[in-house]
UniProtKB/Swiss-Prot annotation:
Annotated knockout phenotype: Cells lacking this gene are not able to produce glycosylated macrolides.
This protein's UniProt keywords: Antibiotic biosynthesis, Glycosyltransferase, Transferase
Substrates-to-products reaction catalysed: 10-deoxymethynolide + dTDP-alpha-D-desosamine = 10-deoxymethymycin + dTDP + H(+)
Protein name: 10-deoxymethynolide desosaminyltransferase
């Protein structure tokens, strides 16, 4: 069959598609990957055939223009699972009102959607697999009649939030049932003579790489898949060939700690200083500008701009990180206890779930201090039950099939869900 994968142009969102794309290719299927031009080199660098569509999104420019305003990586975007209070209509509608223009009009801009639909009409895929915010993939499938599914990169906060939003919406008086996302997709589909269906937001089915005990109960048809890490093109450093002489701890926050942690004064330097007296080997992923701020740190510290997590983490006793999808999932499959400094997007959901399983610690902004980070690391190193829980999660993860293992199920589901093109269904 022909399989079209699509992600908006953000490399970490794309990375989660790569192992599945290769599994399909190795099984003999034709595979194409479509995204805005900015991702073309990343796609071809992963060994897959790229289809540039539309113009590059303006998300980064939008962030600058909207500085200080709520946006999807702003604490105002708190999904129900990460909030102590129940989700109400005003909050749910507020989330939708922010997400609709941010992801739906920018990440899936009109030129991208138009070009993707044109390519799908020409190439006629049997199955479209889309990154969970790249709704252009669902639109292209709806127009051409291809089966389609989301490929998640973490707990299904979008599917869960959508289900709860729809339930709250339907309780409102008819004149107050606003739905910005459905309205946008309805207008978009009108251009191609197709109509909106709720499954355009959740897929006809969902491929979920989250371990079952960490999964959200969305009630949606789901295919479990073992997470396989992909870090892009990378080189394994020589020093990883030798086992560490003392417990190895990784510190990686992805971007500057002040940005990730909301500028509350807890910096990477503060954290390093709190760990300075521990007998550990610390591997800290900091660039040159970040290192310049560091004054006091553990004696056995290795600074590096980048190291592939799948190569580093098997040798680690703990990891301190911000809850990024790839870092979290790679820690899970390597049974590494996690200290998660989680605030944004789905990170609190993941961190709370890991902590509830006993496989790590969740430090939300209100509880985050350098001493709290140090205490969590010491607990992990001193309490073997944390490592035991992390190993339990790893074993659970290995109970799911690999990307190659789900290919027969994808073949079956594609045949089940394929339909005639939209213009032939009316």
């Amino acid at each position: 069959m022909r399989v079209l994968l699509t992600s908006f142009a953000h490399h970490t969102h794309y990375y989660g598609l790569v192992p599945l794309a290769w599994a399909l290719l190795a099984a003999g299927h034709e595979v194409r990957v479509a995204s805005q031009p900015a991702l073309t080199d990343t796609i071809t660098g992963s060994g897959l055939a790229a289809v540039p569509v539309g113009t590059d999104h303006l998300i980064h420019e939008y962030r600058v223009r909207m500085a200080g305003e709520p946006r999807p990586n702003h604490p105002a975007i708190a999904f129900d699972e990460a909030r102590p209070e129940p989700l109400d209509w005003d909050h749910a509608l507020g989330i939708e009102a922010i997400l609709a223009p941010y992801f739906h009009l920018l990440a899936n801009n009109d030129s991208m959607v138009d070009d993707l639909v044109d390519f799908a009409r020409s190439w006629q895929p049997d199955l479209v697999l889309w990154e969970p915010t790249t709704y252009a993939g669902a639109v292209a499938a709806q127009v051409t009649g291809a089966a389609h599914a989301r490929v998640l990169w973490g707990p299904d906060v979008m599917g869960s939030a959508r289900r709860k939003f729809v339930a709250l919406r339907d309780r409102q008086p008819p004149e107050h049932r606003e739905d910005p996302t459905a309205e946008w997709l309805t207008w978009t589909l009108d251009r191609y003579g197709a109509s909106f269906e709720e499954e355009l937001l959740t897929g006809q089915f969902t491929i979920d790489p989250t371990p079952p005990s960490l999964r959200l109960d969305t009630g949606l048809p789901t295919v479990g898949m073992r997470y396989v890490p992909y870090n892009g093109t990378s080189v394994v450093p020589d020093w990883l060939s030798e086992p560490p002489a003392r417990p190895r701890v990784c510190l990686t926050l992805g971007v500057s700690a002040r940005e990730v942690l909301g500028g509350d004064g807890v910096s990477q330097g503060d954290i390093l200083e709190a760990l300075a007296d521990l007998d550990i080997e610390l591997v800290a992923t900091l660039d040159a500008s970040q290192r310049a701020e560091i004054r006091n740190y553990p004696k056995h510290t290795r600074f590096t701009d980048f190291v592939p997590m799948h190569a580093l983490l098997p040798s680690c006793s703990a990891i301190i990180h911000h809850g990024g999808a790839g870092t979290y999932a790679t820690a899970v499959i390597n049974a590494v206890p996690q200290v998660m400094l989680a605030e944004l997007w789905d990170a609190p959901v993941k961190a709370r779930a890991v902590a509830e399983q006993g496989a790590g610690f969740f430090l939300p902004p209100a509880e985050l201090t350098p001493q709290a980070v140090r205490d969590a690391v010491v607990r992990i190193l001193d309490d073997p039950s944390v490592a035991t829980a992390a190993h339990r999660l790893r074993e659970e993860t290995f109970g799911d099939p690999t990307p190659a293992g789900i290919v027969p199920e994808l073949e079956r589901l594609a045949a089940q869900h394929r339909r005639p093109p939209a213009d032939a269904r009316h």
